[in-house]
Design a protein with these regions (language model features):
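Conserved strand-to-helix beginnings and helix N-cap segments that scaffold or border functional pockets
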Residues: 20, 46, 71-75, 159
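Short, flexible, solvent-exposed loop/turn segments with mixed acidic/basic and small polar residues
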Residues: 50-55, 145-146
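Interdomain hinge/lid region at the active-site interface
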Residues: 121-187
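Short, glycine- and charge-enriched coil/turn segments that flank and shape catalytic ligand pockets
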Residues: 26-31, 68-72, 121, 174-180
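Internal alpha-helical scaffold of NAD(P)-dependent oxidoreductase catalytic cores
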Residues: 53-138
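Alpha-helix N-cap/loop-to-helix initiation residues
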Residues: 16, 44, 69-70, 155
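Rossmann-like NAD(P)(H) cofactor-binding subdomain of soluble oxidoreductases
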Residues: 2-49
């Protein structure tokens, strides 16, 4: 689609490195300007009925400029999120993807794994702990597959760390090592 010369564009995607890199690769052919951003707000719900006028208030918004992004463009996009009530952080797109792999993408994958590993016969007995743990797994699987695959490297690292800790918990349980188990559960 055509963009008026000088138009400032941002996005709200869950991964940043590939989006910012794609813009930069074609930047000379485009008339607009781009600054990546990711508001950490929303839910697994979709559609107009899921709208929330306070969605960004008190939430974090991450702005992810490239090295070629003019400072005034970064400030304008940061100002947009700030005006909506968000706390704004500015960081490198790759750093964003690394941090969000640990705090968003891996938790989603783990929630889906917990939901998938729960025997159907156990579901009538699933209480708030199970529901809290698996709530985010109700998100759009097609969308989440794209997010997880787009951030595969950092996500693999985050999931490997989780697998290591899970293995330590399993080892402590199998050994009956209560002290070690308590230590692991406190982290």
């Amino acid at each position: 689609a055509a963009v008026r010369p000088g138009t400032l564009i941002t996005d709200a995607g869950s991964t940043k490195a590939s989006i910012v890199a794609a813009w930069e690769r074609g930047r000379k052919k485009r008339h607009g300007r781009f600054v990546g951003s990711h508001p950490l707000a929303g839910s697994h719900r979709r559609g107009p009925e899921a709208s929330d006028p306070e969605l960004f208030v008190g939430r974090v918004a991450i702005v992810t400029p490239s090295t070629a992004t003019p400072t005034e463009d970064v400030e304008a996009v940061a100002g947009l999120w700030s005006s909506l009530g968000s706390t704004v952080y500015v960081m490198n797109p790759r750093e964003h993807d690394k941090l969000l792999a640990a705090t968003s993408h891996a938790p989603h994958a783990i929630a889906a794994a917990v939901a998938a590993a729960t025997p159907p016969a156990a579901l009538p007995f699933a209480a708030t702990g199970w529901r809290d743990t698996t709530r985010i797994a109700a998100g759009d699987a097609e969308l989440w597959a794209d997010i997880l695959l787009d951030n595969a490297g950092p996500l693999a690292t985050a999931l490997a760390r989780i697998a290591t800790v899970s293995e330590r918990i399993l080892t402590a349980i199998e050994a009956g090592d209560r002290r070690r188990l308590v230590t692991l559960l406190k982290n």
